[in-house]
Regions:
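General marker for long, soluble alpha-helical cores
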Residues: 2-188
Length: 188
């Protein structure tokens, strides 16, 4: 029995050197980049986004954080994961902050407590810690607290202390520790 050679022909649409299997995606890409001056790596990420059938509105979110390719890729990843990337598609955020917000979205944390560029990376991690451990993060998710102060407030919450007296950003870490020590003695 003779084997038949089968030939398959596929149409490929090429725009600016990028290959698309679907005309719609190629046309959307072409329209999106028209009269805009993107760098080569930005075009690659934008092309990848359109190849995933994203609409121009979603691609705009990706471009908004450019020209940083790591930020653009993280926004693309979040969109493909059906996350609300509006929480971190913000040019003011550092990539590490964006990654922490992405982590929170993936893990169903209430990212609205820390999805803000006013928080340092360490402050964000302290808030995430509280969310993961079911602490009352609203007791310390104020950017006026330093990371070290947040740690003291967290410690007080974990020890079951009423931390109201500690919620003063003017207190030094040493003062907070002394107050916590007195509260622990009163608790016994």
């Amino acid at each position: 029995m003779k084997e038949e050679n089968k030939m398959e022909i596929q149409l490929v649409y090429i725009v600016e050197g990028y290959k698309f299997k679907e005309y719609k995606n190629a046309a959307n890409f072409e329209e999106f980049i028209k009269n805009k001056n993107f760098k080569e790596y930005e075009l690659r990420i934008i092309a990848d986004a359109f190849k995933e059938n994203l609409n121009s509105e979603d691609v705009e979110k990706i471009v908004k954080v450019g020209p940083d390719s790591a930020k653009m890729k993280l926004v693309l990843k979040g969109i493909l994961e059906n996350l609300d990337v509006d929480f971190y598609a913000n040019k003011e955020l550092a990539i590490e902050q964006m990654e922490l917000i992405h982590y929170g979205l993936v893990n169903n944390l209430k990212v609205e407590y820390y999805a803000n560029p006013i928080y340092t990376i360490k402050q964000m991690k302290a808030i995430i810690y509280g969310l993961i451990n079911n602490l009352k993060v609203e007791s310390y998710n104020d950017h006026k607290y330093t990371f070290e102060q947040m740690k003291e407030l967290i410690d007080g919450l974990e020890k079951g202390l009423n931390i109201k007296i500690l919620q003063n950003e003017k207190l030094t870490v040493d003062e907070m520790k002394q107050i916590k020590s007195r509260l622990m003695k009163l608790k016994k």
